[in-house]
Amino acid sequence: MIADIDIASIITALQSGASWGYRMVFVEMILILPLFFVQDAAGRLGTVGGWGLGEAIYRFYGKWIAIMAALPMAISDFLEYVAEYAGIAIGLYLLGLPIILGLAAVFIVHTAIVLGRRYRKAELLLLPISFLLVVSIAASTLIFHLDIRTIIMIGLSPIQPYGNASFDYLIAANTGAVIMPWMLYFHSGADSRKKLKAADLKMERLETLIGAVISEVLMSIIVLDGMHIKEINGLIDAGQISAALSVFGGYASIVMGIGFIAAGFLALVVVSLGSAWGIMDALNRRSRNSFIKIYLLESAPALLLVILVNNYVSLMITLMVIYTIIIIPSLFFLGRLTSNQECMNGKPLKRYETAIFWVMSLSIVVAGITGIALIV
């Protein structure tokens, strides 16, 4: 859950609140639908079919199609590494630490975790800190004077300023912030490796639904918190982000900085696992050397890019918009595979479920195309 609400998601929600306030709440809540139905399909592929998405593409579409599908997977992983390193850079900035040296240290430690396969220990250490960051932001929101009537009448109203370039751009960014390509591979791969069966599907779907609702409620709370952050030239200032934790007074920057670094590091760990279950499965590679090569080819250039830029907020929001386009091949294969009798062991998605999946996927793509058009 926390891996899905990562630093880039938090930044996107804070920016949405700073720019549009209550009006972005409706967008966050409506995103429960595509988030649930897309992740539910990934969960079914792993639970009923027993396949990770990358593995299933290789098995049912062959080597060359799988190789082509691996490219957007790799781009997605690279972009996620960029987003997390950018978030960690903001954390270092808030703590007053040297950004380049700090990022280099994070890269070295993360590489050591990858090489030593100490994922579980890292998760146990970082998850509580990351969770506290989200809880702290939520707690800060409660101390502000929120107009409940405005939340209901404007925040939850389906009538919003669609067509406004800034609003539509942030719709695309929020879509990409919660429906991330690598999560499809992580979700399906995790369920298949846990050896879940069709009998476990009801509980698996319930967990996915609860996760989608909690994720978007948290995003909505963060949006409300973002209303109290000042913008500079249409973007929130990294130095002002700690205003989201005003409940901590003079310690806000320290708490936010530590939280950002921990949340970013946790996401790096999860992404490296998702990469193994996506690209390596699609390429039908299982060797340790292949995994290390893929990790270095994705993460090292991402680190370099973040070192070379300085507007981390703009970078992360742009990446969230790009996600909605990069995810297209993954959505296509996921929809086809979950409709395949053989792949799903005779229990594919029903026709109406398939129709809902494609409608939700189309909504993601339309949001992305709109966002990309606004960038160009």
Label the predicted regions.
Residues 26-34, 38, 203-229:
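Selective recognition of specific alpha-helical transmembrane segments in multi-pass small-molecule
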Residues 1-31, 41, 236-238:
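Transmembrane helix-boundary motif of multi-pass solute transporters/channels
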Residues 68-71, 94-115, 132-136, 287-304, ...:
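Transmembrane alpha-helical segments of multi-pass small-molecule transport proteins
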Residues 14-15, 19, 54-58, 86-100, ...:
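Transmembrane helix-loop boundary segments of multi-pass membrane transporters
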Residues 131-159, 168-188, 333-342, 367-376:
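Hydrophobic alpha-helical segments and their helix-loop junctions in multi-pass secondary transporters
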Residues 27-60, 68-79, 226:
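Juxtamembrane transmembrane-helix boundary signature
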Residues 12-15, 40-65, 231-246, 342-348:
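Flexible loop linkers connecting adjacent transmembrane helices
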Residues 105-106, 114-144, 320-327, 359:
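Membrane-interface loop-to-helix entry segments
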